């Protein structure tokens, strides 16, 4: 029991800064929305539309680079720290190449925006302008993620938290300058949010690099002198590990976007109630997601040390802590769902629907916690392909079709509206949780030599 308590303390010490960093990131999006809304409703809508396209694109790159964390954690655990710098440099090369692709996609996103049904031309122009300003921040964001993954792979999660709050503090005044046109800058409205956010990502990257160069604990990890050339073998391995994570993230984000589109014809009340419940459940999701990042670090580190039993302990402890957290957040959600809905909207119909949907959200919080922490465990074992297959099957083969049938058809019951999609979420997330646990159990039952051989690849 003592080893589980000790492991839980270590996991929470790693997870809490990640939680706070995620809160800072969420707050940046909130600030952009509020400040753009203060300028005009059209600008706020433009930022929302632009963000809905930016997120899937940038999260694809983000997921690709998540491969660095278990790689660095295992090199650190095995005492091969001299190899970390080369992995990080190749991570920067990979981030640079992916940035170019993302920037090309975002530059041409106007075709998608202008093809939206009944979209106002002025709104479309502002959304395109916002994206074309924001896309210059894509390299800064991905370079920052490489540096952050280096720190987190070495079990240092506080720097990412600090840089997140630096970004938030810089974002507010820079937004103000470019939205309203102060200090000689042009008045850009919502487009100014894109300029500010792009600048903030570069500030966060430069601040993180400055920290890494000065950190005593990383003095033995220095990038190669001169300009290291791309190493095809290392980059190929990072892509093999990261691409399934990137695709899983992409399909998860697009799932919720598709559901939002399917709900939109049902009416204002249904859309508002769905959005409130989804926004709140996304806030609760920060807890298990941050714990999953910590579990990846601990499992990778233990496997690097050559201890499969300690890796199992880290995995099981992460799951136990996650289930405890999810139970508490589910009780909180059920108990205060109406009061929470009132914070967003005071329309009685909207509040009633949102409260009902939050009840369904509380049901899936434990499944959601298990599946996301399970994903973190599998990343620690470098078993990333299974993450993609599981999430795609659970969300797109089981969850979304089930939700569609329940919400919009009478094949099983009378059309349930948004609640049908939320039952689909429950089916999808529960299926993912079961499959993640089965895969973890399969891996942990392999002979130690095979587990360590797979992890060392």
Curated annotation (Swiss-Prot):
<keyword id="KW-0472">Membrane</keyword>
<keyword id="KW-0050">Antiport</keyword>
<feature type="transmembrane region" description="Helical">
    <location>
        <begin position="243"/>
        <end position="263"/>
    </location>
</feature>
<dbReference type="GO" id="GO:0015297">
    <property type="term" value="F:antiporter activity"/>
</dbReference>
<dbReference type="Pfam" id="PF01554">
    <property type="entry name" value="MatE"/>
</dbReference>
<feature type="transmembrane region" description="Helical">
    <location>
        <begin position="276"/>
        <end position="296"/>
    </location>
</feature>
<keyword id="KW-1003">Cell membrane</keyword>
<protein>
    <recommendedName>
        <fullName>Multidrug resistance protein MdtK</fullName>
    </recommendedName>
</protein>
<dbReference type="GO" id="GO:0005886">
    <property type="term" value="C:plasma membrane"/>
</dbReference>
<dbReference type="InterPro" id="IPR002528">
    <property type="entry name" value="MATE_fam"/>
</dbReference>
<dbReference type="GO" id="GO:0006855">
    <property type="term" value="P:xenobiotic transmembrane transport"/>
</dbReference>
<keyword id="KW-0406">Ion transport</keyword>
<keyword id="KW-1133">Transmembrane helix</keyword>
<comment type="similarity">
    <text>Belongs to the multi antimicrobial extrusion (MATE) (TC 2.A.66.1) family. MdtK subfamily.</text>
</comment>
<keyword id="KW-0813">Transport</keyword>
<feature type="transmembrane region" description="Helical">
    <location>
        <begin position="11"/>
        <end position="31"/>
    </location>
</feature>
<dbReference type="InterPro" id="IPR048279">
    <property type="entry name" value="MdtK-like"/>
</dbReference>
<keyword id="KW-0812">Transmembrane</keyword>
<keyword id="KW-0915">Sodium</keyword>
<feature type="transmembrane region" description="Helical">
    <location>
        <begin position="93"/>
        <end position="113"/>
    </location>
</feature>
<feature type="transmembrane region" description="Helical">
    <location>
        <begin position="418"/>
        <end position="438"/>
    </location>
</feature>
<feature type="transmembrane region" description="Helical">
    <location>
        <begin position="314"/>
        <end position="334"/>
    </location>
</feature>
<keyword id="KW-0997">Cell inner membrane</keyword>
<feature type="transmembrane region" description="Helical">
    <location>
        <begin position="387"/>
        <end position="407"/>
    </location>
</feature>
<dbReference type="InterPro" id="IPR050222">
    <property type="entry name" value="MATE_MdtK"/>
</dbReference>
<feature type="transmembrane region" description="Helical">
    <location>
        <begin position="127"/>
        <end position="147"/>
    </location>
</feature>
<dbReference type="GO" id="GO:0006814">
    <property type="term" value="P:sodium ion transport"/>
</dbReference>
<keyword id="KW-0739">Sodium transport</keyword>
<dbReference type="GO" id="GO:0042910">
    <property type="term" value="F:xenobiotic transmembrane transporter activity"/>
</dbReference>
<feature type="transmembrane region" description="Helical">
    <location>
        <begin position="189"/>
        <end position="209"/>
    </location>
</feature>
<feature type="transmembrane region" description="Helical">
    <location>
        <begin position="53"/>
        <end position="73"/>
    </location>
</feature>
<dbReference type="InterPro" id="IPR022913">
    <property type="entry name" value="Multidrug-R_MdtK"/>
</dbReference>
<comment type="function">
    <text>Multidrug efflux pump that functions probably as a Na(+)/drug antiporter.</text>
</comment>
<feature type="transmembrane region" description="Helical">
    <location>
        <begin position="160"/>
        <end position="180"/>
    </location>
</feature>
<feature type="transmembrane region" description="Helical">
    <location>
        <begin position="350"/>
        <end position="370"/>
    </location>
</feature>
